[in-house]
Amino acid sequence: MSDGTATPDPLPSSSNTSTSLRPTSRVRDESDVIGKLNDMIEEQPTDIFLYVKLLKHHVSLKQWKQVYETFDKLHDRFPLMANIWCMRLSLEFDKMEELDAAVIEPVLARCLSKELGNNDLSLWLSYITYVRKKNDIITGGEEARNIVIQAFQVVVDKCAIFEPKSIQFWNEYLHFLEHWKPVNKFEEQQRVQYIRKLYKTLLCQPMDCLESMWQRYTQWEQDVNQLTARRHIGELSAQYMNARSLYQDWLNITKGLKRNLPITLNQATESNLPKPNEYDVQQLLIWLEWIRWESDNKLELSDDLHKARMTYVYMQAAQHVCFAPEIWFNMANYQGEKNTDSTVITKYLKLGQQCIPNSAVLAFSLSEQYELNTKIPEIETTILSCIDRIHLDLAALMEDDPTNESAINQLKSKLTYVYCVYMNTMKRIQGLAASRKIFGKCRRLKKLVTPDIYLENAYIEYHISKDTKTACKVLELGLKYFATDGEYINKYLDFLIYVNEESQVKSLFESSIDKISDSHLLKMIFQKVIFFESKVGSLNSVRTLEKRFFEKFPEVNKLEEFTNKYKVLDVNYLQRLELDYMVRDVMPEAIALDRGSNNLKRTMREEEDGQAFKKFKANEDPIPPEIVELLKVLPKRQYFKVTIFEAHAFSEFLSDKVTIQ
């Protein structure tokens, strides 16, 4: 069997997206399981399940060196995924009869160090497991017991007081203390102090099983000393009641939250591991609600303790919805607000980009941080890494699912968008030459990018020099690939109208109208040119254009098109002021259709007090927003030839016949 090595092909770069460069396109023997899995990981380095499959294969063959190497790759990519560290530690615990400190302690040091700051309870429980195995109370006596108690207390301070679902830890700690058999009165006193301190800590925190713990505590105090029990219980009662109430609040806001990541290799399956580029939006919203709830500091903690609690929740969210950019963005900004060290934001954004390399949100946020610190090479590296990842995703999709036009077009749009931002960023930092260089690369991508790249570059050229010549040449280049794209032609016309290139507007219009197959976009092109001609040309030329328009679209409402021609500041005042029934978002109260005629007529009905309904005016009695939203989706009144609903008669019926008790 192959050892899984192969000559690595270069990944698709910003200048080449040939699908043949995909790592999974390498030719391998059918039996080369390891090689194939390594290729798949190289192509999709954020797919945790691929690493798990590879790990299980290495474990089955007892290839421990390869197991460690694979775990190291996982940890480098997902350093804050505590459940992956737990998988590694549980594997070590299971395969060793005697614990090897030289193997386990470096792993614990890496994952629990201040640099990473993993504060997940399941990971710290692995730490407790190791400490207890290493320090046997029977053989180690008082020294071993003190070490274990210190370890438990570290876990209390690091994460147990922040975790609402931590009953397993508290039970384990209590069980350890309760089974301590003191050999003298001093040790008995010590034991009582430790247990009381533990109860006073846990019963003040909003967490599960508080009621049962409270009963257990009150009974324990009675057993220790009936004379002092009431005093100790009374001192804790108010805090316990508050914690119980807060826990109920927490349960309500986190209803439906899923926290079931596997912590051993055998538990890990494709269904219970996060999938790259996927996350449950509903789960994300619950996490955001939990974070918002914690930000209110309902426990009235000190600033440092509140920050530690917020950090705990953020890092929990970063594990369970690790492919949601919003979590990383929010966590980075929160840490930036709470720390004087500006590099903290950069650190968390980099961790986020490792997890979601195709995220434009994280790439742009990180590049902003580098720009503020004038780190130009890092800016380019950050944005290009995002571009390369999108290139590879696009190449894979075009090869694996070439008929999925919607997904392909979405990736093309995203790729183009990131290039547009990249052009603007480098123009801002290094000037027009840098922007042109990027545009030159984009041109070589041909139809892998959308026409927006040409439009954006044209605007950049124009805004820098106010010279339309270069900008128009850029847009002409776009016609080579997008001459039949109605959306591109529309935006091209927008630019020409913006810079008042009258002759080019006419030229583009005449050369494009027979190439556009989308009738809606073609209609927009006609309307745009007619409106422009009405502003800068002659009435005869407008009439000529209108004639051609009506011949091509005989179904259009000529009055409506007439009013569109007389817009001012893009507002159709003719419809708003005189033909208001044509406007969907404003409807007068007293417009009705006469039953005996198809002609529209306004009727003014008299109220009982003789007051006529007034015509609606923008500055009088504004329509409530809810009504406006309803009116927006209703069809125009002119589509109804008879009165469907007699509002006045209905109001009279309600007034005269209905009595509200």
Curated annotation (Swiss-Prot):
Q: Kindly give the SUPFAM superfamilies that the UniProt entry links to this protein.
A: TPR-like
Q: Superkingdom, according to UniProt?
A: Eukaryota
Major localization class: nucleus
Question: Does the keyword field hold ATP-binding?
Answer: no
Q: Where in the cell is it found?
A: Nucleus; Cytoplasm
GO terms (BP aspect): mRNA 3'-end processing
Q: One Pfam match, by short name? A: Suf
What are the HAT repeat spans here? 62-94, 99-133, 143-179, 190-223, 264-296, 305-337
| Extent of Low complexity compositional bias | 12-24
Which N-terminal residues, if any, form the signal peptide? none
Give one GO term, molecular function aspect: mRNA binding
Region Disordered: which residues? 1-29
Q: Which Gene Ontology terms of cellular component type are present? A: cytoplasm; nucleus; protein-containing complex
Keyword annotations of the record: Cytoplasm, mRNA processing, Nucleus, Repeat
Q: What does this protein do?
A: Component of the cleavage factor IA (CFIA) complex, which is involved in the endonucleolytic cleavage during polyadenylation-dependent pre-mRNA 3'-end formation.
Designated name of the protein: mRNA 3'-end-processing protein RNA14
Q: Which organism is it from?
A: Kluyveromyces lactis (strain ATCC 8585 / CBS 2359 / DSM 70799 / NBRC 1267 / NRRL Y-1140 / WM37)
Q: What is the lineage of its organism?
A: Eukaryota, Fungi, Dikarya, Ascomycota, Saccharomycotina
Q: Which gene encodes it?
A: RNA14
